[in-house]
């Protein structure tokens, strides 16, 4: 293994001049000798060494090839300052004051948890701008499996017999930031004072790093600042081997960013996957970066290469004009764009150009002329069998759920039938969940020749680990050359959540509506019982869908008044307003128009329309049953048989459908679902609930006797129930709010002042005489399709200063403050309805934040204080979190920290829900206190919550124990949807209890070290981070093996006096400043610097640990410390700073430490901390490392961390707890030995040569056998230093940690991996003789790579030697 000398040791501070002969500058001793002293002496003084100049360690520059293909292996010495002495530069920038710098997770090795972190240290931490620009990627070690040859891109995850993939169980916890309230706790004055110093040195630093192409040097700079997630920027892209045919131009039509994406896409298209299909490329650039021009550039590049046909799929036919514009902008006017929708079926006369089509066109069919024709067959015929042109899937997230939709299957089918096509996926959102990646079959992540045989295997492995694993996949995709993801910087963009209180009048209306819906549930059940309705799945599906939509309209209506106020405030400040909506309510407006023959007496209430439509169309009746029976293909069961009574009892409850709790595309969805087959609803989706809040078994039979089903009074009674309910809804409707969109336009000045870009064809407007009327949105000379484009022009020109956009119009519309338009006011983007999915959210947010803008927009999210409405924010937070990982490689990329506190749809949410329902319905004891101040106390809370849950269909049958069973499948989305139907005070109390339980569970997992926050930053805000050593191990793979690198990292967290004094000069608080402790320990008082926060708590800085994570109260400070001047504090501060580099706190106070006296390590209060990281091809070793972790710590959870060293190198990898280091290294050595053994077999070394001779020059990883592995001094804990297992009395050492072999193996290659006596002198003599006489069969290569090189010239003068000796088996004298 390659071992790099320490850049930093625990003996001296890195920024002080070391005395001569210090440990820092001396070669590290061999921890475990591989041969006896006499042999070492002979070997190290052999004159052969003098004939070669010493070489240094490789620089790992991103411009170089992969490490194993670098100049180091090729025999060329390479000088690298990166691993030289770390103490030569005394200049250190001051640390950020906003980050915790303490760590204790390496202290207690007996703790079973991997990462015992305090609550404080994992809270949200402010972003810092201290990451370098992305062009500093030249300093990033290329530790991934990247090669410049084409074969390097054949597969993303090469398979191996020994690679277990991600199939081992690893606890996957979704990342949900905990809401933290700091509370000062009085600390014991004795030994416990040390404990407050220590906290986990992990946290979230910045999310983005500035992006500049690191290896592509062509093109002009992009006009706007572009960023990449810090996680993705931590790994380099592959070297460029493809040369563009595009003509060079200085026009800037294609920026450097876009040319880089074109280059990598075309380079990836040169690769064939193991399945024989051509590899595809994913452009994950964010909205506004210019994906359209990039795609046009790929098409033009292939056109110039002779591939004259291309397919371009998008979401709307209108975007054909954008495609033509993009091709025109990059000077490709000769490429024609043909709209498939304008071409007749069977017409393939167009010979070349771009065939533009929508995804829905893929499933188009025609029966004209008696022939069955399909669009996909027409496309295939146009392309031809050997088609190798470009297929662009633009906005490819629209093809999500490919396995379950006809459209998605067509997308997959097209890719399979054109295996040589050059596929480009382009989307700002990619897919919002891993399961939506199924259509990206050309990425080569799953399938033949990969670790995952099917997409389902990949999905299971990734979802089991949550978003963190997806971040690793994104990095691996980038480094493999199949993915690129940049987006416009969000600097200058402000996010704000406006939580709106409800007025008493609105709350009264809401409570009346909730009670009426509870009554309606009972009425629907009673009517269904009376008429003997058999299958009720469709009925209850419609009921709960309408229930959800009704309360959604109410939630939105509660915010209209506040939104109008905010909009007018912003307009008064010379800004313009963009308002985002998800639905328009047009369907209900048209229904009312039909009922009243086109005459309206006021604005229409969409909420009332939903309720009335449900009753009129779906109320149980015999007429409805007859219609259903006639229209259904299913057999109708005979009704009224006694055997069916239990079925009726069972189905008398409300039914929850999975699809009911997700977005409905339009208001018409309520009607369109009625005739869908109810077989799609499984029986386990049923929730048993009693109509009047009583246990079902107490009500007697739910259906009347059989004779009553046909009695003369039954139908009349059912009809009377319906009419009574209709009357009550109409009475309520007179108080319900009107259509949100119409009211907004009216209050903001009418259609003359508001540019409406929605999908509706008409609207209700106020007339000057006070009446209202319905009018078409179409204008003279314009079709309805072009009205939105005209409205956009009016907004961009400044004619109108308010724009309202809906989901239907949000794709592809640019509304930013463009430099090229007249209206350059700052955009304020307000969201009335948080979109149902991240797909829609990103599309809407990207409308106002794009390239070439004068100013960045402001985003305002309006959320009412209704607890149930947080359901909508919950969806967005979850979707955006996942989206960040999938599209940009970092889950925090698109996650607003304000929104994250509403994210409940994860593992903790499910556990919290189970606890809440069990506690309320089954009256079990809970550790979480109930909400305080509920009217009537705890007893009333349980009674009201139980009744409320039953009234919204959540509950179960009464069991024999007398307690209600918790519904097994009640998910978070169902729960949050249903509690919308509770009175306001009830839903708020219930939601508060749920939130408290949620927080309690997260806090418990944080205490146990099981909480996953995704990729965390190691020691954020600390600059003194160094690589002390690294060891390279081979990892199995196909077609080539990868490698992982084991790093030892040193972190100096101390705060120098100069920095502390400079910080103190900026303090202004009455109690801010330096403090000395009353208690003197070790003849010296403790010293600290206190800075008051906004509240009454103080942030504390100490000389040995920097910023302390535990906040202190003034009372706590005053009790133990006295305030002093800077002059008084200087000497104790400097003394503590120097002493704590090598001595723990116990030694400082007591002059000795019990652990040290026992020969153990004690890191309490030390400035210097050591961490261990495993970087590289992590997916290939994930299962192995997780198994080791589980064995040592009882938890297989792997924490991914990233860091930036003092010399600006960035690393991302698995953090290895110190207690696991020994076992992990042993596992890696065994894996490395297995790979080398496999490589030896493939090279045909099974037949030994007749005479010993050197091996040929190694050209790949694994052909180097390191016989003199020299780990750095004190690389591992002193109590049990890692050593290679001893072999016995002889001087030989066991290589690579392979197990002892009692008998000599028959396989000569195995000799490489068993212990044996080696006469190094004879080995060297044989190798030197062979230099002059090469065997005829195979000429020897030069011996340049024999020296791994020194890490620099130590102070002692002699270079540290690393020898890599190569020979063929059998060993001499073995």
UniProtKB/Swiss-Prot annotation:
Q: Which InterPro entries match?
A: P-loop_NTPase, SBNO_Helicase_C_dom, SNO, SNO_AAA
Q: Which stretches does UniProt call biased (Low complexity)?
A: 1351-1360
Q: Keywords on this record?
A: Activator, Differentiation, Osteogenesis, Repressor, Transcription, Transcription regulation
GO CC, sorted alphabetically, is:
nucleus
Q: GO annotations under biological process?
A: bone mineralization; bone trabecula morphogenesis; cellular response to interleukin-11; cellular response to interleukin-6; cellular response to leukemia inhibitory factor; cellular response to lipopolysaccharide; macrophage activation involved in immune response; negative regulation of DNA-templated transcription
Under Gene Ontology molecular function, one entry of this record is: chromatin DNA binding
| Chain intervals with Acidic residues compositional bias | 188-200
Task: Identify the stretch(es) annotated as Disordered.
Answer: 1-25, 182-207, 620-644, 1280-1303, 1332-1374
Does Transcription show up as a keyword for this record? yes
- The answer to whether the entry has keyword tRNA-binding is no
Q: Spell out the SUPFAM superfamilies in the cross-references.
A: P-loop containing nucleoside triphosphate hydrolases (SSF52540)
User: To which protein family does this belong?
Assistant: Belongs to the SBNO family.
Please give the function described in this protein's UniProt entry.
Seems to have transcriptional repression activity in macrophages. Acts as a transcriptional coregulator, that can have both coactivator and corepressor functions. Inhibits the DCSTAMP-repressive activity of TAL1, hence enhancing the access of the transcription factor MITF to the DC-STAMP promoter in osteoclast. Plays a role in bone homeostasis; required as a positive regulator in TNFSF11//RANKL-mediated osteoclast fusion via a DCSTAMP-dependent pathway. May also be required in the regulation of osteoblast differentiation. Involved in the transcriptional corepression of NF-kappaB in macrophages. Plays a role as a regulator in the pro-inflammatory cascade.
Q: How does it assemble?
A: Interacts with TAL1; this interaction inhibits TAL1 occupancy of the DCSTAMP promoter, leading to the activation of the DCSTAMP promoter by the transcription factor MITF.
Name this protein carries in UniProt: Protein strawberry notch homolog 2
> To which species is this protein native?
Bos taurus
Q: Which gene encodes it?
A: SBNO2
């Amino acid at each position: 293994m390659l071992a790099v000398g320490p850049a930093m040791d625990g003996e001296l501070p890195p920024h002080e001049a070391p005395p001569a002969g210090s440990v820092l500058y001396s070669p590290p001793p061999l921890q475990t000798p591989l041969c006896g002293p006499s042999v070492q002496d002979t070997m190290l003084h052999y004159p052969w060494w003098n004939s070669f100049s010493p070489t240094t360690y490789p620089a790992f520059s991103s411009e170089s090839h992969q490490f194993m293909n670098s100049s180091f292996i090729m025999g060329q010495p390479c000088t690298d300052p990166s691993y030289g002495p770390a103490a030569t530069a005394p200049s250190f920038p001051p640390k950020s004051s906003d980050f915790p710098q303490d760590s204790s997770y390496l202290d207690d090795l007996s703790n079973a948890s991997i990462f015992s972190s305090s609550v404080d240290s994992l809270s949200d931490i402010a972003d810092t701008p201290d990451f370098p620009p992305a062009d500093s990627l030249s300093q990033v070690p290329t530790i991934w499996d990247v090669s410049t040859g084409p074969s390097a891109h054949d597969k993303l995850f090469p398979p191996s017999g020994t690679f277990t993939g991600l199939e081992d169980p690893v606890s996957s916890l979704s990342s949900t930031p905990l809401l933290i309230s700091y509370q000062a706790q009085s600390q014991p004055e004795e030994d416990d004072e040390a404990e407050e110093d220590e906290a986990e040195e992990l946290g979230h630093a910045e999310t983005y790093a500035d992006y500049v192409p690191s290896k592509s040097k062509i093109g002009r700079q992009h006009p706007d600042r572009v960023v990449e997630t810090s996680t993705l920027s931590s790994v380099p892209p592959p070297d460029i081997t493809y040369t563009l045919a595009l003509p060079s131009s200085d026009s800037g039509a294609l920026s450097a960013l876009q040319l880089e994406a074109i280059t990598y896409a075309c380079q990836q298209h040169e690769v064939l996957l193991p399945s024989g299909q051509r590899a595809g490329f994913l452009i994950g650039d964010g909205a506004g970066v210019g994906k359209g021009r990039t795609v046009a550039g790929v098409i033009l590049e292939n056109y110039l290469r002779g591939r004259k046909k291309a397919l371009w799929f998008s979401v709307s036919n209108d975007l054909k004009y954008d495609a033509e514009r993009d091709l025109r902008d990059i000077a490709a006017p000769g490429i024609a764009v043909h709209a498939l929708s304008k071409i007749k079926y069977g017409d393939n006369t167009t010979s070349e150009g771009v065939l533009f089509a929508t995804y829905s066109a893929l499933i188009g069919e025609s029966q004209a002329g008696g022939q069955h024709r399909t669009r996909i067959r027409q496309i295939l015929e146009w392309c031809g069998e050997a088609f190798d042109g470009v297929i662009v899937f633009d906005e490819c997230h629209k093809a999500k759920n490919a396995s379950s939709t006809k459209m998605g299957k067509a997308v997959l089918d097209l890719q399979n039938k054109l295996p040589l096509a050059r596929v480009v996926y382009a989307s700002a959102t990619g897919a919002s969940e891993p399961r939506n990646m199924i259509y990206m079959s050309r990425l080569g992540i799953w399938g033949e020749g990969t670790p995952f045989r099917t997409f389902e295997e990949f999905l299971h492995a990734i979802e089991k680990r949550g978003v963190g694993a997806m971040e690793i996949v994104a990095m691996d995709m980038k480094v493999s050359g199949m993915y690129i993801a940049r987006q416009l910087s969000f600097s200058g963009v402000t996010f704000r959540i406006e939580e709106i209180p409800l007025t008493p009048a609105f709350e009264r209306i809401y409570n009346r509506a909730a009670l009426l819906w509870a009554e309606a549930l009972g009425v629907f059940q009673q009517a269904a019982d009376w008429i003997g309705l058999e299958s009720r799945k469709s009925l209850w599906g419609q009921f709960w869908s309408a229930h959800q939509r009704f309360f959604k309209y109410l939630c939105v209506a509660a915010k209209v008044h506040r939104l109008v106020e905010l909009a007018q405030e912003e307009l008064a400040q010379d800004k313009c307003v963009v308002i985002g909506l998800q639905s328009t309510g047009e369907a209900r407006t048209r229904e009312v128009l039909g009922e009243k023959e086109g005459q309206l007496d006021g604005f229409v209430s969409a909420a009332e329309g939903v309720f009335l439509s449900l009753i009129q169309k779906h109320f149980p009746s015999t007429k409805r049953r007859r219609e259903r029976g006639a229209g259904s293909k299913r057999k109708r069961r005979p009704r009224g048989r006694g055997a069916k009574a239990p079925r009726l009892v069972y189905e008398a409850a409300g039914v929850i459908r999975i699809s009911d709790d997700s977005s409905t595309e339009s208001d018409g969805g309520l009607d369109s679902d009625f005739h869908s087959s109810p077989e799609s609803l499984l029986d386990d989706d049923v929730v048993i609930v009693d109509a009047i809040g009583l246990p079902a078994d107490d009500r007697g039979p739910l259906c009347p006797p059989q004779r009553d089903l046909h009695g003369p009074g039954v139908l009349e009674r059912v009809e009377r129930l319906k009419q009574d309910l209709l009357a009550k809804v109409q009475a309520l409707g007179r108080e319900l709010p009107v259509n949100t969109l119409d009211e907004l336009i009216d209050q903001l000045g009418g259609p003359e002042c508001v540019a409406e870009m929605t999908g509706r064809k008409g609207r209700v407007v106020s007339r000057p005489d006070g009446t209202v009327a319905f009018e078409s949105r179409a204008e003279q000379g314009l079709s309805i399709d072009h009205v939105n484009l005209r409205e956009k022009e009016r907004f961009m020109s400044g004619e109108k200063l308010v724009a309202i956009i809906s989901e239907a119009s949000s794709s592809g519309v640019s509304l930013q403050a463009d430099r090229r338009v007249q209206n350059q006011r700052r955009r304020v983007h307000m969201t009335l309805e948080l979109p149902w999915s991240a797909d829609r959210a990103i599309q809407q947010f990207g409308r106002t934040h794009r390239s070439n803008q004068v100013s960045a927009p402001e985003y305002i999210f309006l959320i009412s204080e209704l607890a149930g409405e947080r359901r909508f924010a919950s969806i967005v937070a979850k979707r955006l979190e996942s989206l960040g990982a999938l599209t940009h490689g970092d889950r925090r990329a698109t996650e607003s920290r304000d929104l994250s506190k509403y994210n409940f749809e994860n593992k903790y949410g499910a556990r919290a829900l189970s606890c809440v329902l069990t506690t309320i319905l089954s009256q079990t004891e809970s550790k979480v206190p109930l909400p305080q101040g509920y009217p009537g106390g705890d007893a009333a809370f349980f009674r009201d919550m139980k009744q409320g849950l039953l009234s919204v269909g959540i509950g179960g049958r009464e069991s024999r124990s007398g307690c209600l069973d918790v519904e097994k499948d009640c998910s978070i989305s169902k729960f949050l949807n249903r509690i919308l139907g509770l009175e306001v005070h009830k839903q708020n109390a219930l939601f508060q209890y749920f939130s408290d339980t949620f927080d309690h569970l997260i806090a418990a997992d944080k205490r146990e070290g099981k909480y996953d926050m995704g990729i965390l930053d190691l020691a954020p805000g600390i600059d003194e981070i160094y690589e002390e050593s690294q060891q390279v191990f081979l990892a199995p793979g196909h077609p080539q093996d990868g490698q992982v690198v084991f790093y030892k990292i040193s972190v100096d967290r101390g705060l120098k006096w100069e920095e502390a004094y400079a910080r103190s000069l900026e303090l202004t608080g009455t109690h801010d400043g330096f403090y000395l402790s009353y208690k003197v320990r070790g003849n010296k008082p403790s010293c600290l610097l206190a800075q008051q926060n906004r509240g009454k708590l103080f942030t504390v800085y100490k000389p040995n640990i920097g910023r302390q994570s535990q906040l202190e109260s003034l009372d706590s400070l005053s009790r133990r410390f006295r305030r002093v001047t800077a002059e008084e504090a200087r000497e104790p501060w400097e003394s503590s700073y120097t002493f704590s580099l090598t001595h723990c706190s116990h030694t400082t106070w007591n002059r000795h430490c019990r652990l040290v006296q026992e020969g153990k390590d004690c890191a309490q209060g030390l400035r210097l901390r050591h961490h261990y990281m495993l970087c590289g091809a992590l997916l290939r070793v994930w299962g192995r490392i997780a198994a080791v972790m589980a064995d040592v710590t009882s938890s297989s959870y792997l924490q991914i961390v990233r860091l930036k060293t003092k010399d600006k190198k960035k690393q991302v990898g698995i953090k290895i707890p110190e207690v696991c280091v020994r076992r992990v290294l042993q596992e890696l050595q065994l894996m490395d030995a297995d790979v080398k053994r496999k490589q030896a077999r493939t090279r045909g070394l099974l037949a030994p040569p007749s005479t010993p001779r050197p091996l040929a020059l190694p050209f790949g990883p694994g052909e180097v056998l390191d016989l003199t592995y020299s780990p750095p001094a004190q690389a591992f804990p002193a109590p049990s230093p890692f050593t290679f297992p001893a072999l016995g009395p002889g001087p030989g050492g066991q290589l690579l940690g392979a197990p002892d072999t009692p008998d000599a193996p028959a396989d000569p290659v195995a000799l490489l991996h068993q212990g044996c006596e080696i006469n190094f002198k004879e080995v060297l003599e044989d190798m030197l003789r062979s230099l002059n006489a090469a065997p005829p069969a195979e000429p020897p290569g030069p011996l340049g790579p024999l020296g791994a090189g020194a890490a620099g010239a130590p102070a002692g003068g002699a270079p540290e030697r690393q020898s890599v000796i190569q020979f063929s088996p059998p060993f001499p004298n073995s």
